[in-house]
């Protein structure tokens, strides 16, 4: 680290749900170069989603090489590497061969047997303990039940795990293990807090949760802070940051004080509100999770996950084929003065926070002969904003904090109609940053702080620039009337699908 002054770049590896990316930042936190590769989505059965871990590693390695080549840089000019990743996605691999024993089970995966696992946990009376200890709800979303499914269904795997032959990790653990040639098996607190196996109060793997899910302790990674040197990669640059994608975005937005919140608009929407050093227990369906403090140490956050955000627009394009491109939605939504009473509830894979209803299903309400395609497109965009309000209202009730402004990031924030409607339905200012790569930026910031590339949080705050502020324009009565219609529509979609095992 003595020659840090001669190294002028940080690489953020952003391993997402549909693609692997590498983003190179300079000392001013500007993007120098970006490389991206998509990888295959596997759907072996309805509701099942899997990735090939070897393809994830191959694409992530390739984009790092591509980004350096495009920028004309050599790896010895890189001070450190930061990793941010899709969370909850679960990998189990052979410690000797480095080969996965099964595909990665993705965070979106709702396989019916996994729902049965969750139902059994509830029947056995574990739901309250899970919430108190891990901050999570008993839902197939999290890693613990995915790991249990692998150990239950891959022959001999549980015994091999007990013998120390198999390792478990979320995507960050898998990548660092591969990048360090099998020398480092670690995760960070943010990713560990998404497994349903981790006690967020003692900051240790929880013995009772391991017993409940029958997970051998021997296969779990060591848990460390989000900002420290974990080991040298094969290209010699140190791996110096790990953060789950949403916690990385929260840090990249400089939401490091209690009461600050951000929403990332991606495939789903993910709202996090920093609650400082207090783990706020939710009474309204939020998750209590671990975030990054000012120097990557443990802080706490409330989180609400909306399962279908950008995927709703993809549905308009790919299944309904009423738009050619996602960017078309802003034009069509702006052609009509309102949605003409139409509400679209995109519960394609159930409802996330604050409802946590895996049996809800999507529906269109309020259709009349006067409804046009424009109204449906507008209703689709509005559904993203309504779901955001569902979550934010619950967060504010739990935390006792009244949000002054919502910071936003993700692909959909380029849609000015959506951002304005978001401000309108919240009655709160929405702040769109000039730097859109906030997830990667958060990983870069954490890596830079760990290796001395950047000296302080104050230095980083000076690099944050708001590109546009959206002020609420709807009056209170109009806002609440629209939202009441949304709540009515949501209530009609609840508990639609038959429960597993029900007659």
UniProtKB/Swiss-Prot annotation:
Organism name: Pseudomonas tolaasii
Q: What does this protein do?
A: Key enzyme in the regulation of glycerol uptake and metabolism. Catalyzes the phosphorylation of glycerol to yield sn-glycerol 3-phosphate.
Q: InterPro entries given for it? A: ATPase_NBD, Carb_kinase_FGGY, Carb_kinase_FGGY_CS, FGGY_C, FGGY_N, Glycerol_kin
Protein name, as recorded: Glycerol kinase
Q: Which pathway is this protein engaged in?
A: Polyol metabolism; glycerol degradation via glycerol kinase pathway; sn-glycerol 3-phosphate from glycerol: step 1/1
Enzyme Commission (EC) number: 2.7.1.30
Gene Ontology biological-process annotations: glycerol catabolic process; glycerol metabolic process; glycerol-3-phosphate metabolic process
Q: From the UniProt record, report the name of the gene that encodes this protein.
A: glpK
* Regulation of activity: Inhibited by fructose 1,6-bisphosphate (FBP).
For this protein, the record's Pfam families field holds: FGGY_C, FGGY_N
